[in-house]
A protein has these predicted regions:
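C-terminal outer-membrane beta-barrel translocator/porin domains of Gram-negative envelope proteins
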Residues: 334-468, 476, 505, 509, ...
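Gram-negative/organellar outer-membrane beta-barrel architecture
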Residues: 157, 161-352, 418-433, 438-441, ...
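Positively charged n-region of N-terminal signal peptides that target proteins for export
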Residues: 1-3
Length: 524
């Protein structure tokens, strides 16, 4: 027994000696690499540190020094890669987290910088300034921005602020910059570009009216009414096939940016051609007259979760033979609910995955009979900026699905390109001769959109983005259930005030038709 204890003691002593020798060897190798770097012999330092890192793979110090050498060699991607490797070995390392956060900040990737800074209790803010100062009620602005001087800017606070500003919906562009102040503190500068017309007064009104003239429509908009973030939108369309008169008013409830209201009224007089309900040769013509009103509210429940609820009522009259329940005239009363939630983000790789889900319940009081309305829809959207800095390249993909029962045909899901439709298969027409009904229509649908954009022109107050797309989808429960696909290119002109003009040149792969379509909208 004594001999066993003696052998164990000798083994422990030998292990301790080997560990001490390894530490001494690692210190010497590290000192050699640092000395070469201080002499500006960066290539030699890189080779020496890399060889030593292979000898001591569990020592994060070599990776940290390699990151510094890569930075001096202007290899920023290599520096960030080495820092991430080092922080996997030593997650709480102050120097590594500070270094990596600073590199992300230089790239303009504030979320990634905060994801590293917050691990070590940084960055501490000296003050928050606005440049320029937003024309917004001071109480609204103070409550919308959830961080201030003397606080640590966390991802949680940043996300809560971004949600509040989204709900206010008065800024076309936002940018938050951090600059060192001293003593380890930072000054946060918020640059909030308001949604504005290129012209003011009479010329601004005329410009707003002229935007819709190519589409036989005029649109009036007023944003940030009385500096309280109330936004009003009015639309009049005199197209003989789809007349429309609509008004929408939205804004925060009281002076709380995390709660908002929305009131809308919508009147339509439309003529529809509905081919392929029973066979490809059948075309059913219908005239729809509908008036609708909706009142709703939006609530930010957490920094990432938004819930909206509304009550909607509408009355419709459908001229033509009532071939089934979908063509019955009458009243509808519904309650609609929706939640929006970012479900997955990789700030350092600039990837974001978001989702939303909606539920609608109600009653259709038709002339023939009354029936229950029940339906829902959901969406998952992925967005990736592949470059470490800037957004000249952007890849997007989205999946949508939904179903509803008990509603008239005009409440079905419509997948063709039409300005009144929320879901598009780009390249597939949604109207023929100006009449709705040409695209896939049904009580249930599946839609997948994909594409990428590249900035091809950037000048003051104007940006042009273009890129290819491929969309595919299927609607069932009304028209013949078939998969429709479209491919082509989309060009977007983004003006500084938040106005976007889009041109789509696509091909319907099922019908073999070329489709050209354009639209004007807001992009914030």
């Amino acid at each position: 027994m004594k001999r066993c204890f003696a052998l164990l003691a000798a083994s422990l002593s030998l292990t301790a000696q080997e560990t001490a020798a390894q530490e001494t060897g690692a210190d010497a190798a590290l000192a050699e690499g640092i000395a070469l770097a201080r002499q500006d012999r960066f290539m030699e330092a890189n080779a020496a540190l890399l060889a030593s890192q292979r000898r001591f793979p569990a020592d994060a110090r070599f990776l940290l020094e390699l990151a510094g050498v890569s930075y001096r060699l202007k290899n920023l991607a290599g520096a960030k890669r080495r820092l991430r490797q080092a922080l996997r070995l030593d997650p709480a390392n102050n120097y590594g987290n500070e270094f990596l956060a600073t590199l992300h900040l230089l790239d303009g990737n504030l979320e990634a910088a905060l994801s590293r800074w917050n691990r070590i209790g940084k960055p501490l803010l000296q003050e928050v300034v606005f440049d320029p100062v937003p024309i917004l009620h001071p109480t609204l602005l103070q409550r919308a921005v959830t961080f201030s001087g003397g606080q640590i800017l966390t991802l949680r606070r940043l996300h809560a602020t971004e949600r509040n500003l989204d709900l206010l919906n008065v800024f076309a562009r936002r940018q938050l910059d951090l600059a060192p102040f001293g003593n380890g503190r930072y000054v946060a500068t918020y640059r909030l570009l308001p949604a504005a017309q290129p012209f003011r007064g009479r010329w601004g009104t005329l410009f707003a009216l002229a935007r819709g003239l190519p589409y036989q429509a005029v649109r009036l908009e007023r944003t940030n009414i009385a500096n309280r973030a109330w936004n009003a939108h009015a639309l009049y369309r005199w197209d003989a096939q789809k007349r429309r008169l609509a008004f929408d008013l939205a804004g925060p409830l009281g002076k709380t940016p995390s709660r908002a209201f929305r009131i809308s009224i919508d009147g339509r007089d439309e003529r529809w051609d509905l081919p392929g309900i029973w066979s490809p040769d059948n075309i059913y013509q219908a005239r729809l007259r509908r008036a609708a009103a909706e009142i709703g509210a939006y609530f930010i429940l957490r920094e990432k979760l938004t819930w909206s609820t509304s009550v909607r009522t509408s009355k419709r009259s459908i001229a033509g033979a009532a071939l089934d329940d979908a063509f019955d005239s009458g009243w509808t009363v519904e309650q609609r609910n929706q939640i929006d939630l970012p479900i997955f983000t990789l700030p350092e790789h600039r990837f974001r995955l978001t989702a939303n889900a909606g539920l609608r319940t109600g009653r259709f009081l038709g002339r023939a009979k009354s029936r229950r309305i029940l339906g829902g829809d959901s969406a998952v959207t992925a967005n990736w900026l592949p470059q470490a800095k800037g957004d000249d390249w952007e890849l997007r993909a989205a999946f949508y699905a939904g179903g509803v029962g008990g509603v008239p045909f005009d409440e079905y899901f419509q997948l063709g390109m039409e300005r009144d439709n929320p879901h598009w298969i780009r390249g597939v027409a949604g109207s023929r001769g100006g009449r709705k009904g040409a695209g896939p229509i049904g009580s249930s649908f599946v839609l997948v959109q994909s594409g990428f954009d590249r900035t091809v022109l950037r000048i003051p107050f104007l940006r042009v983005k273009a890129g290819p797309f491929f969309d595919t989808g299927r609607a069932a429960g009304f028209s013949i259930p078939q998969w429709h696909s479209g491919t082509g290119a989309q060009v977007r002109l983004l003006a500084g005030g938040g106005v976007a003009w889009s041109l789509i040149v696509g091909r319907d792969l099922r019908r073999g038709e070329m489709v050209f379509y354009s639209t004007v909208s807001r992009f914030f």
